[in-house]
């Protein structure tokens, strides 16, 4: 049974997620060295914590920079720990994940700038971990996918770091909340329209979502120039309010000349990969690994 997620009370939702995580088995870290480092944050902001996963058996000098999900308001590097252990092992890559500040306490641009600061550090220190700076992919699910899309735009416009590939899993990229799937899916598991409203109000400030002044770095669906971005993979789920914005963003990337692979998984909903035994979940997980390995040239 999947947990019900209601983010109308953000502190309560965070506490619930922490309790659920406490009941999960500890991941097997055999063959993976895990270290936390503190790196400079954005100018005038606190330092940022990165967690680095380095497999004993790597498939090449490749790296993955992970940005966790959670609607901009939930999650941390502990919540994504098991997934990143598995990702590092399966891909055979060094995985670095970032502890970014959360909204509403730290609204846009704080989470994105934290993620950018961490990416800059990883690119500058990649060789210390046996990674070629030109072979780093960014990877995020849900709000993490939205942050990765914003990160790709920011890195392009600031002249770096170079990003080899962007993996955008069920990305949260459009604050306007007007797509057919966002309008229709008001009570779907884990993520739904009411949760999306809280998410964007928290990230941008109440009354700002849907207005004319929203930055494309915050809501990449707003971007009018997607040229020059790294190749992308965009996944969407059939019964997910984020479905249509993900599809639209993938098609917009394609129209801008960006190589894109766009995938809709049938019979799925937001977070349905938590049902790990389902065949479609195994297919999605297997494809994620294959996509990243292929994109990074291994």
Positions of PLM-derived features:
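A glycine/proline-hinged amphipathic helix-loop "lid/cap" segment
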Residues: 1-55, 209-210, 290-298
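Proline/glycine-enriched tight loop/beta-turn segments at coil->beta junctions
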Residues: 44-48, 55-63, 226-229
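Alpha/beta-hydrolase active-site loop
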Residues: 106-128, 288
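Gly/Ala-rich beta-loop-alpha elbow adjacent to hydrolase catalytic centers
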Residues: 140, 144, 148
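Hydrolase active-site cap/lid region
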Residues: 153-211
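Short beta-strand/loop motif that positions the catalytic acidic residue
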Residues: 234-236
